[in-house]
Amino acid sequence: MATSLSSAPTQLRPSPSPSHHRLLHRSSLLPFPRRHHHRRRRCGALSIARASASAKDGVTVRRFPAAPTEGGRLAGVRKIMILGAGPIVIGQACEFDYSGTQACKALAEEGYEVVLVNSNPATIMTDPDLAHRTYIGPMTPPLVERIIAAERPDALLPTMGGQTALNLAVSLADSGALDRLGVRLIGASLPAIRAAEDRQLFKQAMDRIGLKTPPSGIGTTLEECISIAEDIGEFPLIVRPAFTLGGTGGGIAYNRAEFEDICRAGLAASHTQQVLVEKSLLGWKEYELEVMRDMADNVVIICSIENIDPMGVHTGDSITVAPAQTLTDKEYQRLRDYSVAIIREIGVECGGSNVQFAVNPADGEVMVIEMNPRVSRSSALASKATGFPIAKMAAKLSVGYTLDQIPNDITKKTPASFEPSIDYVVTKIPRFAFEKFPGSEPVLTTQMKSVGEAMALGRTFQESFQKAVRSLETGFAGWGCAPIKELDWDWEKLKYSLRVPNPDRIHAIYAAFKKGMRIQDIHEISFIDKWFLTELKELVDVEQFLISRGLDQLSKDDFYQVKRRGFSDTQIAFATSSSETDVRLRRLALEVAPTYKRVDTCAAEFEANTPYMYSSYEYECESVPTNKKKVLILGGGPNRIGQGIEFDYCCCHASFALREAGYETIMMNSNPETVSTDYDTSDRLYFEPLTVEDVTNVIDLERPDGIIVQFGGQTPLKLALPIQQYLEDKKLVSASGTGLVKIWGTSPDSIDAAEDRKRFNAILEELGIEQPKGGIARSESDALSIASEVGYPVVVRPSYVLGGRAMEIVYNDEKLIKYLATAVQVDPERPVLVDKYLIDAIEIDVDALADSVGNVVIGGIMEHIEQAGIHSGDSACSLPTRTVSAKCLDIIRSWTTKLAKRLNVCGLMNCQYAITTSGEVFLLEANPRASRTVPFVSKAIGHPLAKYASLVMSGVTLPELGYTQEVVPKHVSVKEAVLPFEKFQGCDILLGPEMRSTGEVMGIDYEFSGAFAKAQIAAGQKLPLNGTVFLSLNDLTKRHLAEIGRGFRELGFNIIATSGTAKVLQLEGIPVEPVLKIHEGRPNARDMLKNGQIQVMVITSSGDALDSKDGLQLRRLALAYKVPIITTVDGARATIDAIKSLKNKSIETLALQDYFQTTDASQNLQAAQSAS
């Protein structure tokens, strides 16, 4: 007879308490120490630290006088300008759309007129109905000053837009613009910003209140930095630039050469050409505290966060846990007192701040690392972890309210001055994209490199950790119980992966435990606290227990104990050699199902009015589903390259529209950065992994009328077929009783038809739609045969990808064979698509909208600036098109309409076309879902396409919406991609078919040249109006050289070029100065770049691989010296037009509302809501 988990004394055994269970081990039969499973403080007492508090531990505190107010509001303030964060970049992602959106709503709620400045069209905050005036364009001091002069706001709030907004505010103050225009800074004063961001001033402030900082010095030149390093006396050293984002330009130096390289980069990246050189605290533990202060000098601690990775890894790249788990209560109180003293000393009078500490695990010594005097990435995490809306509260504090005057939105009974108390554990794990940047080393340092993150909540650390791993969507259903590659590594390789921080270190820990390494040994190599390692070792022991049992031997109690440790059905299936379906059926037969707990800010001491849920395997369920009409919207999970904020934007619009139309909306997502996971975006929020198991659990509980899968990108689309199969098997009746639960919009079968190459080819042939010649290869010989038939170059990619993953243009058999062997491992189960690459073709993007009765409307037709072959997500594009003939546009409209009808699209569809130089049109791909261009198109045409699409899915027709024909605006909108190359040393910056951009900006003007110029400036590309241009074009593009050369000469630029390019220009009669290539001698192009003799570079490559070493070096050097670099001919043409526009006229600044003469671009929704 099988022994159960709960009955065998020689097996793993839980303690009686379900929420504080421990495991017993064979070896000791003693419970492992479980220190601070969660920290819970009572909500009853007013948890405010006041200035009258006496100094503790040698820490002194200061009081600042409160600003004058009018009944809780700042005197004389009626109109407020909010600065956004600009495009999504590494270190500054959609958490600032979340904070900016909260701030806009909070201030409008208080009756203020809000003016918003932001360059990112993919944000909710830039919707024209959120602020009274919305400016989408470059965020540079001169242009923002002109907007301030036009709008005349009374105050400027810079603390909601990350480092971008803070630096911009400092520049405006330093230039005297704010004083000249009578604008006051709110949220954080200029002295407070300087004291926190300026490394020297911060260090002095800490010295004044008796707090330690690491031994360090401030350098403004390389020579000063070297002198500081000599004074400190030993490597490794940490370099931290001032006024930068995500540790940009910083790093860890282990020797003199590395140190000098990092210092050069740091000085160039710093807003003030200042870096902090400090002694390394590698191996110390790192903690963060989120702090808020009001004008009456009340201070509350919102949340403590602990980094599992020790010091040396940027907190954005570290796995973090809230509340802190390994602090004693005395240690926590000490950090709390220090945080209060710091926020007062720095002078943040009203709003939130993030304070980071290092603690020596040997003796408890504490050092202060840094402080952010603004809403930060950690603030968003703390908000989602606790349910306390930090950004909203910070916005209200900035206009004079005190914490005890602001009600808690979740409880409705407590004020914001009650510190949140939580009875669960939150784990955040970052997501990386090193595979997108070949040549870059996957090592984590003080410079942030992650592109997204997933968060999970559980009653224990183990449960939340496993759910967070599952939420990452990197192929793991949890931690362990999988055939990971690290199990095959030798000891040296495994130890290296444990010692050197990297994205896969958690899997190396699993492999080390499986191979028999002890907790102490892993701790000594990795410096990860033994408490966390003990928790992880228990999970390995539970897995071993499962392996020793068959599925049918697991009792109900066994299931509960295993599920409470976060194990998914997939993991249990792997360990018990069964299938996920078998596990689910067995679990449900034993009546083991998750319950849902509420995030309520007060550990259940008060009733929560806002249903914000997470799952756990306990006995009481706090989710109370209704029998109203309702819709479940599946989000996009963690941000990644190819699937980012644009999809979250669509999910939010679906929730807004359907709530307005009378539906109860339920959001399910795992991304803490987003607006979709804000507590008030939907009627109910389930913060859960997006897997078949977790989604079907919510479906079983809620039984919604509809499920929306087409807005969250590839994540929910991959779930569509298994969810459809589940619904067909279960035949669940919706809670409202109006019919069966079903997937709304385009059917999963139609989605599959568009993704399956064979089915899709048959549909195109039936409709008479042309596509590039190509085929499906299931072996190397297949691929070579197809390439021979269609002719090189060819585009090769795996089927079912998003963001051009593993896509490449290859030019010969040798490169194709290498691609098949290294990039995709082609076989019959993993076919590869091989298509003819259309040289010099123009690429077109189309977003269309279709309803359930066959009406189709073109939302927008965009023309890419770069040629076909560069991923659409990395290419700039314009709307309307500028060079496409009416005939080609008619073909595109006809084919898009026919395809939407044939696929029975209900909702959004995106199509991509290529137009050859001879005017032939080819369809490249079609996606019956929301695309990443939907927010851009919506802003460009003044119609909220995602809102329309969600209403269409509910049964409203396009005529009922009043949206029946394509809108072609009089103005021109240009979208430009923002790329993160400066974060990935060693990788080339050439663009290709694999997407690598992290974000986007938008420029709007009545001429293309002006719109393109605005987009370039907004993306950080400084366009010079004169100087010297360096030209180096490869043989494929030299035929365009004369045109490009003449264009720059007509603008007054001098031209320098490498020998081959110079000869072509001289033959065309264009003046040019030849320059040596790097390998030809000196002075060469590299020397001229370093000497500041080159203002703009045009340098192309064949794109079949990294080109000559010279080209790679020059491109990387141009990036380091912030010289604009253009890598395509079409990009060079557009840049010439843009510079001409900038020379001929000043940049015009208009609000989005001015282009549409309305303050609400979604007014057509009124008819739809009444119709539905």
From Swiss-Prot:
Residues 1-10 have a biased composition (Polar residues). Residues 203-399, 761-954 form the ATP-grasp domain. GO terms for biological process: glutamine metabolic process; L-arginine biosynthetic process; pyrimidine nucleotide biosynthetic process. Residues 1-50 form a transit peptide. Residues 474-623 are annotated as: Oligomerization domain. Binds 4 Mg(2+) or Mn(2+) ions per subunit. GO terms for molecular function: ATP binding; carbamoyl-phosphate synthase (ammonia) activity; carbamoyl-phosphate synthase (glutamine-hydrolyzing) activity; metal ion binding. Belongs to the CarB family. This is Carbamoyl phosphate synthase arginine-specific large chain, chloroplastic. It comes from Oryza sativa subsp. japonica.
